[in-house]
Amino acid sequence: MASLSTSVVASASSRLWNPAASNGKICVPSASLSLRTGCRRSSSSLTSSASSQLLHCSFLSSPVSLASPFSGLSIAFDLSSQTSGLNGQRRRGLVVRAGKAALCQTKRSRSRKSLARTHGFRRRMRTTSGRATIKRRRAKGRWNLCPKSNPSSGKRA
């Protein structure tokens, strides 16, 4: 099976200074844009079918950049007008893939206070008496279930 493909890649990055940060960090977000075309030829059937032309764009974050809702996202546009399948349906023109951290920020850029809050809640849920305490506070209608879970951890000395 022979395969022929061409790829054109362009990338861009810009340096931004964040005046809100006290230590004057430089943020380096970067994005890449690539155009992929290709042609596949099968040796068993002497027909050639061109694979879809994709315009692919991805947003990458660096360790010094600010958290952005676009970091970890990947977008691809299908530029070909070919049909696929037996019933002749058109392929989708836009494909968006998002990483886990970009969707709900499970691991990145969480404050010390929010980490301490979850730690206090999980510590209460570990024991029988802690679970009973949370159950009583829920029955009472409390919004803050664990008020004593490191309240000053958001402030750094």
From Swiss-Prot:
Transit sequence range: 1-97
GO CC aspect terms: chloroplast; ribonucleoprotein complex; ribosome
Protein name as it appears in the record: Large ribosomal subunit protein bL34c
Coarse class of the protein's main subcellular location: plastid
InterPro entries on file: Ribosomal_bL34
Function, as annotated: This protein binds directly to 23S ribosomal RNA.
Annotated compartments: Plastid, Chloroplast
Pfam families xrefs: Ribosomal_L34
Summary of subunit composition and partner proteins: Part of the 50S ribosomal subunit.
HAMAP family: Ribosomal_bL34
GO biological processes: translation
Entry GO MF terms: rRNA binding; structural constituent of ribosome
The family this protein is said to belong to: Belongs to the bacterial ribosomal protein bL34 family.
Keywords annotated in UniProt: Chloroplast, Plastid, Ribonucleoprotein, Ribosomal protein, RNA-binding, rRNA-binding, Transit peptide
